[in-house]
Amino acid sequence: MRYNQFSYIPTKPNEAFEELKGLGFPLNKKNSDKANLEAFLRHSFLNQTDTDYALSLLIVDAKTDALTFFKSNSDLTLENLQWIYLQLLGFIPFVDFKDPKAFLQDINFPVSYDNIFQSLHHLLACRGKSGNTLIDQLVADGLLHADNHYHFFNGKSLATFNTNQLIREVVYVETSLDTMSSGEHDLVKVNIIRPTTEHTIPTMMTASPYHQGINDPAADQKTYQMEGALAVKQPKHIQVDTKPFKEEVKHPSKLPISPATESFTHIDSYSLNDYFLSRGFANIYVSGVGTAGSTGFMTSGDYQQIQSFKAVIDWLNGKVTAFTSHKRDKQVKANWSNGLVATTGKSYLGTMSTGLATTGVEGLKVIIAEAAISTWYDYYRENGLVCSPGGYPGEDLDVLTELTYSRNLLAGDYIKNNDCYQALLNEQSKAIDRQSGDYNQYWHDRNYLTHVNNVKSRVVYTHGLQDWNVKPRHVYKVFNALPQTIKKHLFLHQGQHVYMHNWQSIDFRESMNALLSQELLGIDNHFQLEEVIWQDNTTEQTWQVLDAFGGNHQEQIGLGDSKKLIDNHYDKEAFDTYCKDFNVFKNDLFKGNNKTNQITINLPLKKNYLLNGQCKLHLRVKTSDKKAILSAQILDYGPKKRFKDTPTIKFLNSLDNGKNFAREALRELPFTKDHYRVISKGVLNLQNRTDLLTIEAIEPEQWFDIEFSLQPSIYQLSKGDNLRIILYTTDFEHTIRDNASYSITVDLSQSYLTIPTNQGN
């Protein structure tokens, strides 16, 4: 374990003393540090009346137990504090450490010892070996009662809301939409979980089209074959129009007011929401139009879908109506809500957070968007090509519609509405235009970057630099496009398409607690969070602060002095093998074992680089045909320790999200010996070589120059590292698999790579 603490708010000695006293610790400024430490320890043994025995189980040095020490006349030393602090945080002497000073240095322990009250205060805010902060562990053990009132420590809400007395209710929010032309406004089902309290409370909202169920068989049947011919396109310039965001003005309902009349027993919850539920935040889960319990069509990513989620935030602020049922005869008021909302969730869920933020909806104070899509074209297409998300060849937006249109999972709904649904789905399948792979109005209507200037909320993004599902370009684009007037924060980790709130190496939960206590509960805690926090790829459990995602300097590296050719065609056996399992293709590609058609360029580095942003390949090429795919990957190649991309369990169910509530595993990315690491990659239709909206003809055997931007990353490279560039045609994981007989020739003497860095790195 190594500490990377971003959540602690520096506290003055007097303030620390008052907070400790407020928690019930019997401290006294007139007493010695030793006496105050003993009082602190005895009060911490919440489940034991025999505190002498509890003290006797702690040690203050390699030979003395704490009970003996406190009965003696020995002075309290720094070494004594170090032994005790480590034990309070769950580290075991003679197992985890023998020399506390050296161990504390190794784990980057953030606590100082100048003032006993400041020191104990900071200690309480530190995470233990199990992942829980000491204060959270003590509250769970009974330091404070679950009295359904707010209690704070170091600017963060504590788990004092009773999760055994939760209210679970369902309402149906009326939208301004009619996505299936039914003649009625679409209703959206909302599942609410909230503590029983007299306070008006903020809301953690997860907008998840998956939460009411998914239709795997329909999606599987809809999934496309990737084998086919790459189209030769007519040269043209694509025209699109940005439509202003607008919706029908709603007026207050005059219907009778009623409490919610529908409840539920269970819903798959997001554990970060659970953490905040026990701290006085309501949790709501909304699947939006076209899902089970709601009405309407699954419009998949456009602003109609976004509006269906926006209506829920408007209801929390008293602006639209929610009904007790589909009868629409009684309304429910959100009189428990303070109107302030934070959205949460990963992937599609985080994507809806971005879309909501771009509406500028009142009441949305914070989005916590993890691995979020910023433009749907970049999810299912790339540079004029159909480009499946990593791991899902053949998926497209209409396949996702089939997966998430969960109304068809309800038989009565199916027989009434499936014909209309199928007609709308067919229209969607035509609009996505798999034949050309080009940008068009349909994709433009699902590009949230067009409305990013409307964002008013505070923004928190997390993204994996090894996420080839929702690729890093999504967060790179949106984060750098956000208005300068808002506060924005970005956590970039070395994992794939995963959550990071339950990792051992970073206090993400506690940082979000400080931020949401500030923004949604109005606590003036002076919390400041850095703009870009990046997981260092060279060292285990180490996070660094950067000024920006994207460097201000470009380093140029030549690619060689020869001309090399890439064949596209494979023999039938090899082609069928790679089509059957794209992982076989990737393995052969990265090994460079002459089984795949590729150009491999090894670039031994002559100095250190902190790669920060989008690498670009500047290539002089010619092709033998009027169509061609060019794919590229950049690898850090050669044996050394690197991160795996999927976190593994450190301790099972050790993370407590309240008082023994919704426990989950503590995880971390393994750091092990490996042969290579993908830094970046990309694919390009050479007919779209200038920009996304311009289609140009290819003249066979005629040289032309291209600039090819790859996926952005932040990656520390060292002098002597081998940077491997692989150039090839068909990517069997992502692109159309056209086995046509064409080739691409690259003039390496006229080609180079640019690496984005910060000046001086």
Swiss-Prot record:
Q: Where in the cell is it found?
A: Cytoplasm
Q: Which gene encodes it?
A: pepX
Q: Which GO terms describe its biological process?
A: proteolysis
Task: State the protein's name.
Answer: Xaa-Pro dipeptidyl-peptidase
Q: Gene3D superfamilies, alphabetically?
A: 1.10.246.70, alpha/beta hydrolase, Galactose-binding domain-like
Q: Which family does the similarity line name?
A: Belongs to the peptidase S15 family.
Q: What is its EC number?
A: 3.4.14.11
Described by its record, this protein's role is as follows:
Removes N-terminal dipeptides sequentially from polypeptides having unsubstituted N-termini provided that the penultimate residue is proline.
Catalytic function, reaction form: Hydrolyzes Xaa-Pro-|- bonds to release unblocked, N-terminal dipeptides from substrates including Ala-Pro-|-p-nitroanilide and (sequentially) Tyr-Pro-|-Phe-Pro-|-Gly-Pro-|-Ile
Q: How does it assemble?
A: Homodimer.
Q: Which InterPro entries match?
A: AB_hydrolase_fold (IPR029058), Galactose-bd-like_sf (IPR008979), Pept_S15_Xpro (IPR008252), PepX_N_dom (IPR015251), PepX_N_dom_sf (IPR036313), Xaa-Pro-like_dom (IPR000383), Xaa-Pro_dipept_C (IPR013736), Xaa-Pro_dipeptidyl-ppase/CocE (IPR050585)
GO annotations of cellular component type: cytoplasm
Instruction: Give the originating organism.
Output: Streptococcus agalactiae serotype V (strain ATCC BAA-611 / 2603 V/R)
- On whether Protease is a keyword of this UniProt record, the answer is yes
Active site, per annotation? 347, 467, 497
Its Gene Ontology molecular function terms? aminopeptidase activity; dipeptidyl-peptidase activity; serine-type peptidase activity
Q: Which UniProt keywords apply?
A: Aminopeptidase, Cytoplasm, Hydrolase, Protease, Serine protease
**A Pfam family assignment:** PepX_C
